[in-house]
Design a protein with these regions (language model features):
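ATP-dependent adenylate-forming carboxylate-activation enzymes
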Residues: 68-84, 97, 102, 163, ...
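Flexible loop/turn segments at secondary-structure boundaries
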Residues: 47-50, 74-78, 103-105, 124-126, ...
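Conserved small-residue-rich beta-alpha loop and adjacent elements
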Residues: 1-88, 92, 155, 277
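Short, solvent-exposed amphipathic alpha-helical segments in soluble enzyme
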Residues: 55-58, 133-134, 211-212
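Structural alpha-helical scaffold elements that stabilize or flank donor/cofactor-binding regions
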Residues: 58, 106-109, 272
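Conserved NAD(P)+-binding/catalytic subdomain of aldehyde/semialdehyde dehydrogenases
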Residues: 38, 87-193, 198
């Protein structure tokens, strides 16, 4: 068998030499005189995979011991995580604890905790870092500990217009609908606003195809806290919202809010994350596709 050589083009930031780059790689494994660091991980409640990713990253990429507080939404997974990570728990580099916001606040402010990582909403992050809106506006954090976070947001789906075939249009509409339906819309990366070109001759047909594709999925349980409130807030602000599918007890129908006015920059759909099975659509005006 002939030996194969792999080649890659590596780009470095301006001012960073090859020597600098090599020196900074795997730094935690080169420095033998590091001070111990305790990382508090406030686990995600919506996607269990994120919990494992976070603690593994802290342990093996950042060389920090981990105190994981399970989210009350999926704390039933705690015993399974303890079983999977038992060797690390036995060595004393990982420990799981349980509780809600009160316990989380206590741990964030505990003097033994050096750094914090969380997965959640911007509201939770602000509560941890600033406490009140006044502190946030004045940029007065409650804690000087490093706090990293994976937060949600108003994620756009930017549709590039073109002379799509019927099959292409239907396939892309299915992709957008599935993206929302995944985990009932309770993902930080779920689509929240579909952005289209107003003069695209397939605009109306595409939006209709997304609606049809979403209707192929049954309504899902609104298992995440405050989902019903998010749903109600958006529907109260947009009477033209289209409810898709029948919802049983404890379920929420899928919702598409069409024709958002892009000039209304403070619209709830542009400013707030709809953490449920809901998204909106807005059409931008431009003379041509490059302008769009």
């Amino acid at each position: 068998m002939k030996a194969c050589k792999a080649f890659a083009k590596v780009w470095l930031e301006p001012g960073v030499s090859e020597t600098d780059a090599l020196a900074s790689q795997a730094r935690i494994y080169k420095d033998k005189d590091q001070a111990g660091t305790l990382a508090l991980v406030l686990g995600a409640g919506n996607v269990s995979m994120l919990v494992s990713c976070d603690i593994t990253s802290k342990l093996f990429l950042e060389n920090q011991v981990v105190l994981l507080k399970m989210n009350p939404v999926n704390d039933y997974l705690g015993p399974l995580i303890e079983e999977a990570y038992r060797p690390l728990i036995q060595r004393g580099v990982l420990k799981l604890v349980y509780g809600g916001a009160k316990e989380g606040a206590y741990l964030v402010n505990h003097p033994s905790v050096d750094v914090v990582h969380m997965t959640g909403s911007d509201k939770t992050y602000d509560a941890i870092v600033f406490g009140t809106s006044g502190n946030k506006q004045a940029r007065r954090p409650l804690t000087m500990k490093p706090v990293t976070a994976e937060l949600g947001g108003v994620n756009p789906v930017i549709v590039v217009p073109g002379a799509w075939t019927e099959a292409e249009l239907r396939e892309q509409a299915k992709q957008v609908a599935f993206w929302l339906a995944l985990n009932a819309g309770f993902n930080c990366l779920s689509p929240r606003v579909i952005v289209t070109w107003k003069k695209w001759d397939l605009h109306d047909k595409f939006v209709s195809a997304v609606q049809d594709a979403l209707g192929q999925y049954p309504a899902r349980k609104a298992y995440y806290p405050n989902a019903q409130r998010f749903h109600n807030d958006f529907l109260s602000a947009h009477k033209n919202a289209i409810r898709i599918g029948a919802a049983g007890e404890g379920d929420l129908p899928w919702v598409l809010i069409p024709d958002l006015d892009p000039a209304q920059k403070n619209d709830i759909a542009f400013r707030s994350e709809a953490f449920c099975g809901l998204f909106a659509e807005t059409a931008l005006d431009a003379a041509d596709v490059p302008g769009y």
